[in-house]
């Protein structure tokens, strides 16, 4: 990997956004022979700092297959906790959904990895390529596109000329705004409070999701006797909770977990993030494509946010490799439309499911509560339906790109 800052850099693909999806895209593309430049406004050291992001991500089985195929997983594996079971409950109800990896019999449902360790692994793999340039910290000043290509001018004066621009720069995407791609937004008036805990008893690789009137409360297993918590709460209460003393906050956390993990202790910081649904009406424009949160940001209720972004990556890499093989322009709208058509339907289904589940479970109305409890009991008893939900959790439903099946692409 080279990190020089020339006045004009010529590259096949320029990526704005050096987060987890952006770096995965860079590696996937470079691993298949493309010359790639990545731009991010945050210094590399900050992206891997303990204080930058306290979140952990549930990586579906298919996402892990992708990361293995492009050589990232060996750097992540020591920090990855297999998810062997998922238990979903409706508040204090004794009825619950239970998903067990042994039912499908071909590996865990997924893995939990702290975002910091994922970023470190991605940077380690990035350094093995001489066809990736990383420009950071750099801020985009302007973007221009024409039939010949795209030019991204940075505030430092550096210009990056390329055939294709990828916007992987999050919900507030500069690239999406430049392309004037409209979005729809739903505000849930909820925040996700995130922290990690150490606990006395083993989690046994089980992920728990409890639906409470204020929103879901997730207990997600990490390596060792540790878990990551995602506590969804009504936005107007979040400042009060975040300002609690360490002892009072820990007491609230322990009360919500219950006693099954024994004594619990909050370790590290606590973070709060607003929760909303946002999706672009189109993922592509001339010589431009959106990936990940720049295209779609969803409720964390399903743990699928990063997985959707990695599916985008796998699909786009396959589309571009196929186009290059037959001599097509990788920035052509006809090529990029293949990517958009592949991903739009799958992503839209996830928007609808996560939005519906959040609305269905984030209340305590008696008849609705009874109906959803009976629904969970029915899913537990109907094996094909239960297996369908498990396959969704593993990311193995639908027309999967080859990389999500762990297969490399022919040049």
Language-model regions: role of each:
Residues 67, 149-153, 158-270:
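Conserved FAD-binding catalytic core of PHBH/FMO-like flavoproteins
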Residues 30-52:
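Glycine-rich FAD pyrophosphate-binding loop
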Residues 53-77:
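N-terminal glycine-rich dinucleotide-binding loop that anchors FAD/FMN and/or NAD(P) in oxidoreductases
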Residues 21, 44, 172:
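Conserved Rossmann-like nucleotide-cofactor binding loop
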Residues 239-333:
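FAD/FMN-dependent oxidoreductases across multiple families
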């Amino acid at each position: 990997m080279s990190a020089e800052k020339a006045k004009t850099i010529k590259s096949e693909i320029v990526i704005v956004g050096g987060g987890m999806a952006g770096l995965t895209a860079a590696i996937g593309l470079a691993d298949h022979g493309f010359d790639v430049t990545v731009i991010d406004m945050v210094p590399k050291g900050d992206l891997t700092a303990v204080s930058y992001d306290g979140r952990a991500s549930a990586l579906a089985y298919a996402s892990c297959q992708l990361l293995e195929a492009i050589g990232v997983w060996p750097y992540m594996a020591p920090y990855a906790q297999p998810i062997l079971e998922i238990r979903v409950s409706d508040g204090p109800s004794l009825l619950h959904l239970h998903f067990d990896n042994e039912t499908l019999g071909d590996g865990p449902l997924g893995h939990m990895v702290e975002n910091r360790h994922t970023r470190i692994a991605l940077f380690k793999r990035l350094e093995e390529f001489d066809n990736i340039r990383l420009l950071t910290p750099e801020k985009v000043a302007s973007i221009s596109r024409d039939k010949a290509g795209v030019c991204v001018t940075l505030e430092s004066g550096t210009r990056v000329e390329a055939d294709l621009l990828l916007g992987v720069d999050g919900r507030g995407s500069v690239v999406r705004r430049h392309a004037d791609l409209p979005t729809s937004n739903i505000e849930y008036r909820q925040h996700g409070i995130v922290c990690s805990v150490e606990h006395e008893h083993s989690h046994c690789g089980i992920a728990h999701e409890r639906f409470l009137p204020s929103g879901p409360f997730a207990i997600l297993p990490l390596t060792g006797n540790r878990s990551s918590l995602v506590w969804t709460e009504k936005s107007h209460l979040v400042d009060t909770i975040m300002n609690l003393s360490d002892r009072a906050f820990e007491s609230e956390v322990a009360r919500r977990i219950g006693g099954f993990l024994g004594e619990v202790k909050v370790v590290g910081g606590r973070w709060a993030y607003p929760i909303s649904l946002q999706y672009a009406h189109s993922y592509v424009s001339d010589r431009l494509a959106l990936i990940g949160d720049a295209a779609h940001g969803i409720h964390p209720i399903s743990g699928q946010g990063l997985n959707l972004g990695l599916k985008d990556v796998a699909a786009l890499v396959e589309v571009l490799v196929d186009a290059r093989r037959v001599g097509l322009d990788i920035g052509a709208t006809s090529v990029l439309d293949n990517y958009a058509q592949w991903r739009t339907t799958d992503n839209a289904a996830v928007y609808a499911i996560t939005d519906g589940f959040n609305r269905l479970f984030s209340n305590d109305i008696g008849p609705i509560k009874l109906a959803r409890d009976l629904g969970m009991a029915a899913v537990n008893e109907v094996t094909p339906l239960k297996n369908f939900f498990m396959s969704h959790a593993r990311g193995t439903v639908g027309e999967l790109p080859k990389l999500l099946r762990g297969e490399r692409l022919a040049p």
